[in-house]
Curated annotation (Swiss-Prot):
Glycans are attached at N33. It comes from Mus musculus. Interacts with TYROBP/DAP12. The gene is Trem3. The chain crosses the membrane at residues 139-159. This is Triggering receptor expressed on myeloid cells 3. GO terms for biological process: cell migration; neutrophil chemotaxis; neutrophil extravasation; neutrophil-mediated killing of gram-negative bacterium; positive regulation of innate immune response. Pfam families: V-set. The keyword Methyltransferase does not apply. Its main location: membrane. It is found in: Cell membrane. Induction: Induced by lipopolysaccharide (LPS). Interferon gamma (IFNG) decreases expression. Residues 1-19 form the signal peptide.
Length: 183
């Protein structure tokens, strides 16, 4: 095996180990909604409170929405545009943020809320970022789609023109078959 392949494999393994420490980045446009799920250990946290928090650079995270019930089947909490749905039987928390605005840019986390100073982060933190290039990307993809279709039809047209009258003339075998069928 070549040293280059070994080196690439090692780099892939190392980068995979570091990925758990990184944040998940999501970009949004004004007015969009964000929905994500946070799985948790059913044996440990099914009856614990859950929360959605904004992480500040200094000080404690700000709790935006917190469940206040510990039912075994379903717990829900709403605070403004934040909705938290806890499904203990499925061991997952569903977070929905409606009507995202520019001021929502920042770092967030989904947690098991044991106390204000004691939380357990359920998944990678989410960094919300403002998307400015998304409309441009839609235009580029649309133009690419149109150009691609134009290219396909141009090639098809060239092949049909090269085939010329051969395509339009009936073949000799069909005339012979037609005569034998009449007899």
């Amino acid at each position: 095996m070549s040293p280059l392949l070994l080196w690439l494999g090692l780099m892939l393994c190392v980068s995979g180990l570091q990925a758990g420490d990184e944040e998940e980045h999501k970009c949004f446009l004004e007015g969009e909604n964000l929905t994500l799920t946070c799985p948790y250990n059913i044996m440990l946290y099914s009856l614990s409170l859950k929360a959605w928090q904004r992480v500040r650079s200094h000080g404690s995270p700000e709790t935006l929405v917190l469940t206040n019930t510990r039912k075994a089947d379903f717990n829900v909490a709403r605070a403004g545009k934040y909705l938290l749905e806890d499904y203990p039987t499925e061991s997952v928390v569903k977070v929905t943020v409606t009507g995202l605005q520019r001021q929502d840019v920042g770092l967030y986390q989904c947690v098991v809320y044991l106390s204000p100073d004691n939380v357990i982060i359920l998944r990678q933190r989410i960094r919300l970022a403002w998307c400015q290039g998304k409309p441009v990307m839609v235009i580029v993809l649309t133009c690419g789609f149109i150009l691609n279709k134009g290219l396909v039809f141009s090639v098809l047209f060239v092949f049909l023109c090269k085939a010329g009258p051969k395509v339009l003339q009936p073949s000799k075998t069909s005339k012979v078959q037609g005569v034998s069928e009449k007899q």
